[in-house]
Amino acid sequence: MTEVRRRGRPGQAEPTAQKGAQALERGIAILQYLERSGGSSSVSDISGSLDLPLSTTFRLLKVLQAADFVYQDSQLGWWHIGLGVFNVGSAYIHNRDVLSVAGPFMHRLMLLSGETVNVAIRNGNEAVLIGQKECKSMVRMCAPLGSRLPLHASGAGKALLYPLTEEELVGIVVNTGLRRFTPTTLVDLPILLKNLERAREQGYTVDQEEHVVGLNCIASAIYDDAGSVVAAISISGPASRLTEDRFISQGELVRDTAKDISTALGLKPPVA
């Protein structure tokens, strides 16, 4: 008969397990607090609101940062919800929310435009690609899912920006700067604000080789039932095919698709 022996002293594992559970509960509480705070907060506010020692709060934030659940703003020192939270919650997104609703509309847009269709969400000061329908052309422009895009220099990024107030836009620019990626990147704030104002009026924005030379994108914002921007839908193609003379017709197509998705998410049309 085989004898099973236990390692360690009796009862030794229980306190360790309790400490681990407590740390997990506190980490979840921090993420929930960040969510209630609009996605970001200072370590002192987190510590005070959750009644945690400052040193404990900072240690837990560093653990969450290592898993990409949070990240720290290098200028202000504030902590923000990170991309890891999206990765863990991707199963929910696939079962519901934007992608599950947008799927048929993305396919229709791909067929009508002849270009690759993308859906992106905002994560902090970047746009993140979460969905894609590749076009059937031999030459197509496709970025891998999870790709991060600059807000000021990409179609999807600008579509996530143009519904915001000027104060919010300036705040983002202060945090991120206006890095130049190509000769046509908008790196002057007044010009960028004017570009976004025009996009707001027409319901779509154009990225004319502003992020990648040879790549043009047209994008529009998607809204939820509360009227909040939740994502952006875009088409992307080589500049030799998605040419300037097609921007208006394709822009209206992207805009109308974004409206259809927003309606499917519960957005009510404005009362005339």
Curated annotation (Swiss-Prot):
Alphabetized SMART domains for the sequence: HTH_ICLR (SM00346)
Q: Name its GO BP terms in alphabetical order.
A: negative regulation of DNA-templated transcription
Any idea which residues the entry calls the DNA-binding region?
43-62
- Keyword terms, alphabetized: DNA-binding, Repressor, Transcription, Transcription regulation
| PROSITE patterns listed in its UniProt record | HTH_ICLR, ICLR_ED
Q: Where in this protein does the record put region Disordered?
A: 1-20
Domain HTH iclR-type intervals: 21-83
Domain (IclR-ED): give its ranges.
Answer: 98-267
Pfam families with a match to the protein in the record: HTH_IclR, IclR_C
- GO MF annotations, alphabetized: DNA binding; DNA-binding transcription factor activity
UniProt keyword DNA-binding, yes or no: yes
Q: Which residues bind glyoxylate?
A: S154, G155, A156, D207, C217, S234, I235, S236
Q: What the protein does?
A: Negative regulator of allantoin and glyoxylate utilization operons. Binds to the gcl promoter and to the allS-allA intergenic region.
Protein's name in the database: HTH-type transcriptional repressor AllR
User: What organism is recorded for this protein?
Assistant: Salmonella typhi
| Recorded name of the encoding gene | allR
